[in-house]
Curated annotation (Swiss-Prot):
It holds the Pfam family CBS. It comes from Methanocaldococcus jannaschii (strain ATCC 43067 / DSM 2661 / JAL-1 / JCM 10045 / NBRC 100440). This is Uncharacterized protein MJ1426. InterPro entries: CBS_dom (IPR000644), CBS_dom_sf (IPR046342), Diverse_CBS-Domain (IPR051257). The keyword Repeat applies. The lineage of its organism: Archaea, Methanobacteriati, Methanobacteriota, Methanomada group, Methanococci.
Length: 168
């Protein structure tokens, strides 16, 4: 009995990654995070493979990586309820904290992708079955698999959503 993801393609063969992979939207390791955020929003994606200047796959970046960076940069932002005696100083202290927060946020958004990306990239080959790809994603708790050829060149990407679409 085959698993549910061993769906057959139109030729009656088990579906492979190459049957469902999409053209990847990529970022480069020297991009600023603000540029990556804009790219993610524009393309409605939550992660992307990272290439170096030679076009080689060197990492992967996700919204989680970006959020961790922003949170790390802003750990000192502590706004607590003031005592009645502090009310006189509160507007000034709050303004300074907000100013510090905005400065930290600007600095965080200038961070380079190479400084926050995940370097250990789990990849798929085009001839991998979609069932094996699903197992790999579940085992490693990842949402996307870059697809590489035998030379390690990025040729596509498969997401959990792509696997689900393949079932329909």
């Amino acid at each position: 009995m085959r698993t549910i993801l061993n769906k057959l393609n139109i030729n009656g063969e088990i579906m492979l990654i190459k049957d469902i992979m999409k053209k990847p939207i990529v970022v480069y390791e020297d991009n600023d995070l603000i540029d990556v955020i804009r790219l993610f929003r524009k393309n409605k994606i939550s992660g992307a493979p990272v290439l170096n200047k030679d076009g080689k796959l060197v990492g992967i970046i996700s919204e989680s990586d970006i959020v961790k960076t922003i949170v790390t940069h802003n750990e000192d932002l502590n706004l607590i309820l003031p005592s009645p005696l502090d009310l006189i100083e509160l507007p000034l202290k709050t303004a300074l904290k907000i100013e510090e927060f905005m400065e930290d946020l600007k600095n965080a958004l200038k961070t380079k992708v190479r400084d926050v990306m995940t370097r250990k990239v789990i990849v798929a080959k085009p001839d991998m079955t979609i069932n094996d790809a699903a197992k790999l994603m579940v085992k490693n708790n990842i949402k996307r698999l870059p697809v590489v050829d035998d030379e390690g060149n990025l040729i596509g990407i498969v997401t959990r959503g792509d696997l689900i679409e393949a079932l329909i």
